């Protein structure tokens, strides 16, 4: 009876190699040229760099939106001078409004 128990323990200790394949493209056999051209597919992602990139792009988009909003506000205002020589800022009005 010792032989069946030893066979079951051997089966538990050495699982088939198919279960331990590396997931994704790292386990696929590819050429060196493909790996050189597409290194981002085989390198482990660097999360701090990804977070830095997302924050940087978000800040750039926010800054461009801010510049667009302030430029639009500047276009609608102009400095007017009345008959007495006083200067004041007026909002542009259209003849069609």
Swiss-Prot record:
Major place of localization?
Answer: membrane
Superkingdom, natural source: Eukaryota
Q: Where in the cell is it found?
A: Membrane
What would be one Gene Ontology cellular-component term for the protein?
membrane
User: Which UniProt keywords are given for this protein, alphabetically ordered?
Assistant: Membrane, Transmembrane, Transmembrane helix
Question: What sections of the protein cross the membrane?
Answer: 49-69
The ranges of region (Disordered) come to 1-26
The membrane topology noted for this protein in its Swiss-Prot or TrEMBL record is: Single-pass membrane protein
Which stretches does UniProt call biased (Low complexity)? 1-14
| Record PANTHER family | SMALL INTEGRAL MEMBRANE PROTEIN 8
Q: Which family does it belong to?
A: Belongs to the SMIM8 family.
Q: Identify this protein by name.
A: Small integral membrane protein 8
Its taxonomic path starts at: Eukaryota, Metazoa, Chordata, Craniata, Vertebrata
